[in-house]
Amino acid sequence: MSNFTPAWFKKGFFNESLFCDDFLSTHQLLYSNGAFFTPDGRMVDPMPLRCEIFEMMREYVGANLAKKVTNVVDVLKLAAQVEDFPPVTDRIALANGTLYLDGTFQEGKPEIVRNRLPVKYDPKATQPTHWLRFLSDLLYPEDIPTVQEFIGYCLIPSNKGQRMMVIKGSGGEGKSQIGVVLSRLFGCNMKDGSIGKISENRFARADLEHTLLCVDDDMRMEALRQTNYVKSIVTAQGQMDLERKGKQSYQGWMYARLLAFSNGDLQALYDRSDGFYRRQLILTTKDKPLSRVDDPDIAEKMAAEVEGILLWAFEGLQRLVKNGFQFTESERAKCNRELVKRDNNNVFDFLESEGYIRLKADACTSSKELYEIYKMWCEENSLNAIKARGFSDALIANQRRYNLESTNNIANSSGRRVRGFVGIEALVQPDLTPNSWRV
């Protein structure tokens, strides 16, 4: 044992508080929202911290050393606690410094950050040819800027864009290779997850705290029973109520972006609101050529270009910021969203059908009569009818689009005043006999 005795160990007594003061005087460390943060970002694994504390203590503290290390870590949480540690959105912390949105770069790690990417900034990095060729083979040219902007969007802890992305294909195109490359770019700041789990498990959101990106590599095809958790993540622009199993809920920063690869659409079982679909950027892949021979090493080749991919994504981020966080969206992508929306809500097709109803400014029809006609249209077209309440809600939500007006002052066949819509005329009417119709 050396002759030097630290201030936190005097006369055989170990002072945990003084130890933490000594430790924090030589280490940049803070504790907030249930996690330690350093100049390297969030401390994902506390074991290196415990090991360093152990090495400092082992020469002076003998019995129950492991337990005392645990106690020190707990005291360190109190000593390093800060009231708030909000995300900073005008810069990207990288392995060799900080890249600001205006393009300036500062070397070194002078400050504690929430997230630091494991990639070096090299303004002279070569163009990522494998990556660009892969995207060119996978996606339509007009959709590549959207991917560029979305990946760039994920570099900063901000949800201002209020969009998630779904890349949809038939299978075998290689779209999931994007996730492998992003894992190299984001490191521990990205998580593999499940959109379905997020939608149905109230604890799943807390698992995405401090995370920049969540990738669902193979999104489930089942429609989501509830969408509020997913929508809240996509649009969060501040602290959110988070809950971990067996613990009291708390307010935490949420800025994780959602990216899903799928062979189908992201649908909702009950939510047919425009907001659910408006938050999705839906891209479709090209058909895989029958003659194409897949390169089994393509993911590794692209990952080796990660410094060039960073520059490419940063260019997309700068364009997105310049456009006020409005994503570049091709007509194909817009059409994809409209098709998904219509597929989940056949009320649109009913309103645009012929022979059942007619849009007419001076006409009016009761909600009940419209729903009965809608059910007949569904039956004759082998479609599933939504419930009456959902049907009325869909009409109300889109009444401006079809020049309708919701009212509770329509006279039915019995002369009673009921709910209905002005601007639509029934061309068929239900008879009193069930399942019987007359024109």
Language-model segments: residues:
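Short, small/acidic-rich helices and loops at N termini and domain boundaries
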Residues: 1-2, 35-64
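Feature primarily recognizes SF3-like P-loop helicase cores of small DNA viruses
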Residues: 1-32, 58-439
